[in-house]
């Protein structure tokens, strides 16, 4: 499923495509910079069921991906650990430096090796 519609002029909305008929329905309305929330009233029961199934399948696929890519967990947990230890004032700058550190891939690789030896 891919979002491909554009919002009507003068309105900022997120759109998603559903089912065989490619019906486009508004799911979330935004105002300014924030999302107001889902508007289930715009979906018929069949679309709500499709959305629920899509969410479940997406969560399952994401979980499978994370289980087969342990490095993602190591990257995120390492980032949070360093962030909480250093408590930087500029989190965006800190994140940019953390994830572009040329030593990061070898650190993650060493952690993966260490975890494999432990199991």
UniProtKB/Swiss-Prot annotation:
SUPFAM superfamilies: Dimerization-anchoring domain of cAMP-dependent PK regulatory subunit. CDD domains: DD_RIIAD1. Coiled coil: none annotated. It comes from the Eukaryota. Residues 70-104 form the RIIa domain. Abundant in tissues rich in highly ciliated cells, such as testis, trachea and olfactory epithelium. PANTHER family: RIIA DOMAIN-CONTAINING PROTEIN 1 (PTHR15505:SF4). This is RIIa domain-containing protein 1. The gene is Riiad1.
